[in-house]
């Protein structure tokens, strides 16, 4: 089972929203302790998800935290960070995608692979909102913790 995330890159979270995310993740992990979590590593919501999952990994060691990179470039700065904060790095099949579309196509790939999309979407514009709309078109199970 795979869970992925989409959320606004710049936002502040209430303690209630942070706890809501944590409790949702615990509930899902208890259903299937071998979940894989696909994370994009961009913005505030991705950072919150990574921090929460790393905290939960102390109790649920079987979960995998996977950084899904939009770029194959070995000099991509986030790859070095990913080596220390994720269990592995995945390069989706994006070799033929122009660099300016790589993040969008990576997000779509993550949605296609996922069984559940956990979102933090408060408004209808931007890349995160586009990813959420894509997940809806693909009829993915979605939980938006911003509501």
Predicted ranges, named:
Residues 1-147:
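Acidic/glycine-enriched connector segments
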